[in-house]
């Protein structure tokens, strides 16, 4: 093949005719240069910039400008490729032997994912130079899944593999997989398996799972105590459970029944443990009928002298209610379930010629109000207090007459049940709980203002008269402080009162203490951080927003920040380190607004409003685990009065 002829140099295309013509005249050659100096001749030549390759693009860019490339799929694609290589046995440099199983892998992949393998392959261990390593105390299938996880970052945790996968992940220090196993077990907690999961977590040092499982056992003890797992527990663990202050039980009867069931599951071997177990049952909190009809009748209990002493202690607690303050022990302290939170209940009240039987409750954890079951009787000017895990609505006014009736609210069943009536009709009364007893003082019986007082024992279902106050008081409030009752202010049918008196249950005596700075009836009274607070009320001329505080140590009252709204016929309660002023009347209308006081800042701020306007309302707080009750409407209202 002949080479293609090239156009002669110095020729160009004529722009006019398109035919060859003479090119431009060549420049003359440069004149000869004189010889360079010696130093110049010996200097190394600098390299010339390389001529651009044919077809290359000459870039003109700002100095220092560059572009970073980041492939988000690089790691994924690389590990996918390595996983395929492992499956085909390519470039594998380690074989793991466990039982009869062989697992091929790459040391660098295992060492990069597992601190266990990193130490094995990078330190001066013999395995670092070996191509075959035998592992012990690990399930073969679990190891295979974890090696595969090292390449794919994916693993499925389920009922079929979690019990082998978790210890294997712990051994290899694959904490992410270990946490996934714990999360799965946490989601599977049930009364039938929670004790087993708790033991499994303890055996493998899964502290968070252990705490969660133990909390679940305490919270669901009634159901857990009926399972086979509970019956097989060793004595030490049973003692740990039934002695816990955090046990969630509707009554101490459940603890007693659980203990007896455990003993009778293997009665010959376990009857010797009955005295130790009964010391953990809070017998004084059982009703007298249950003590005599069940505990004293049980042969396993009756035949042990130590158990007889415990039974006598419990009966003495019942027979001497006025001495409960000095008879108190760990067995007389009500249990408080771990995880329970305070719930504020607003009960009854009235608004615009209406008397309410409905009730609502506020959960601070969710900042929501919930409607709960209505009372069987409409009640305004009612006294409300909590004893144990129940709420009591005492007396009041139903729109026709003043009431002696009492009913209690069970938050577990969301129902109200009738209780034994007081000996006297009372509205506008003061009610408070002390040492498991319910006290009612003063009030109005439909004919006269009262100074009498009486006490209710829920364990025996009986009302007993106690010493009368020195002053007749209706629209009075009563609170408990340092083992004593304080009756604050009120109205004696002729004047609004600033006086205060204190009741000491051990001696059954009322005595005067320092009077308030202002006359107040229908005020709110509560105790917070060792001080007695009184807020609002009526002084005979106007509705008040002023607030004062009494210190028993100083024996004097002092003013604190006033409420934002004038209130009387409201109620005051302490909750979560705050004081809550609930409802009431501002002098012209009933209120559904709430405000709360922070003693650390000495300020009142608005809180979420109730559904319903309520004056002459009763308020108390219960510590509840499961709230709200099923099918309860909820409401979140702005922090202003509607």
From Swiss-Prot:
Residues 640-642 are annotated as: Interaction with PDZK1. Residues 194-296 form the BACK domain. Residues 1-53 are annotated as: Disordered. GO terms for biological process: actin cytoskeleton organization; proteasome-mediated ubiquitin-dependent protein catabolic process; protein ubiquitination. One of its GO terms (cellular component) is actin cytoskeleton. It comes from the Eukaryota. Keywords: Actin-binding, Kelch repeat, Repeat, Synapse, Ubl conjugation pathway. SMART domains: BACK, BTB, Kelch. Pathway: Protein modification; protein ubiquitination. Residues 92-159 form the BTB domain. GO terms for molecular function: actin binding; molecular adaptor activity; ubiquitin-like ligase-substrate adaptor activity. It is found in: Postsynaptic density; Synapse. CDD domains: BACK_KLHL17, BTB_POZ_KLHL17_actinfilin. Kelch repeats lie at residues 343-389, 390-436, 438-483, 484-530, 532-577, 578-624. SUPFAM superfamilies: Galactose oxidase, central domain, POZ domain. Residues 289-641 are annotated as: Interaction with F-actin. Residues 21-37 have a biased composition (Pro residues). Interacts with F-actin; the interaction disrupts the F-actin structures and leads to marked changes of neuronal morphology. Component of a complex, composed of PDZK1, SYNGAP1, KLHL17 and NMDA receptors. Interacts directly with PDZK1 (via PDZ1 domain); the interaction is important for integrity of actin cytoskeleton structures in neurons. Interacts with DLG4 and SYNGAP1. Interacts (via kelch repeats) with GRIK2 (via C-terminus); the interaction targets GRIK2 for degradation via ubiquitin-proteasome pathway. Interacts with GRIK1. Substrate-recognition component of some cullin-RING-based BCR (BTB-CUL3-RBX1) E3 ubiquitin-protein ligase complexes. The BCR(KLHL17) complex mediates the ubiquitination and subsequent degradation of GLUR6. May play a role in the actin-based neuronal function. This is Kelch-like protein 17. It comes from Homo sapiens.
